């Protein structure tokens, strides 16, 4: 089966956010460019479907108006998401890097928590830390440890997150997120390499992050 590109999907604009609907027929490879999003309708197939990331990093979030795009998980190669276990309104999958995934995967059995449940638990723990600064510190460490790589005294995350999204993840306003990020820049603990979509963080910052358990 040939890979499908984002252009093959029907277009919709809910609540000011653009996405495309996932095709009803299972596909062995669907490709998205960074910033593109597909919505998965759990009612489109009896019993739902199982998505598996083949390459890249994705953000899974709830499309409900009430939750305003609440992040459920970040997924990378090998991670799966069962659509029948999530919001009845469906889920959205956003490509943070060039992304390839399949919608006809066989669910892994006997793995305990699935990828989405485990991520949601960790994000919930972060939201309960005492201050916005601690929550940001823990969030950056979680993302780097799960999705990034260490290069000497620095750690690289292969994508950037907007200040608005950081605010959603740590339960703060965009203004607070911007202030905290600016502080890390002044302390030379965070950098955004020119011409690259990545985020660079000091290894010492990641090592000193709060332990989530």
List each model region and its residues.
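Polybasic "coupling" helices that flank or enter modular domains
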Residues: 111-172
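Cyclic nucleotide-binding regulatory module and flanking cytosolic helices
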Residues: 1-38, 46, 80-81
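Short histidine-centered beta-strand/loop micro-motifs
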Residues: 39-45, 63, 83-85, 125-128, ...
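Cyclic-nucleotide recognition modules
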Residues: 65-123
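Glycine- and acidic-residue-biased ligand/ion/polar-headgroup-sensing regions
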Residues: 46-65, 76-78
